[in-house]
Amino acid sequence: MEAKGLTPILNVSDIASTVAWFEKWGWKKLWDWGTPPTFGAVGSGEEACIFLCQGAQGGRGRGANTTTFQQDGDEAGDKGVWMSVWVDDVDEMHKQCVAAGLEVTFPPTDMPWNVREMHLRHPDGHVFRVGRGVEAKK
């Protein structure tokens, strides 16, 4: 049997402020549950969806590691979740995030593994590697 999808669940400190954070870089609130909300979801496009759980289901917290190119494993001190988000234009997304005052920890860069990427950190410590594939240099 094959999986039909995968939806990460992020432990966040506040559903409403996290939804607002995602909206700053183009995501939309899909739904929330509870009064006040303690669970919800944001989405982008046809397929991308992330569940948000206030204070449960996984870790959160800011580590000292701002990119993936520093320490390994437990030494990194990361408590949040790292995810890759694929977009059409990394540079345009970077401009949008900077204009919205979001924390970009690594600017758009062509990496040796044929991906142009930037890193964006959520206030609860989760890091998003925003990227797109690029042609291999010959």
Spell out what each predicted region is.
Residues 127-131:
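Short C-terminal beta-strand
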Residues 1-9, 24-121, 132-138:
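Vicinal oxygen chelate
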Residues 16-17, 92:
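Alpha-helical macromolecular-interaction surfaces
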Residues 18-22, 97, 125:
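Conserved active-site tyrosine of GNAT-family acetyltransferases
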Residues 11-13:
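Short, surface-exposed ligand-recognition loops at beta-strand->loop->(often short) alpha-helix junctions
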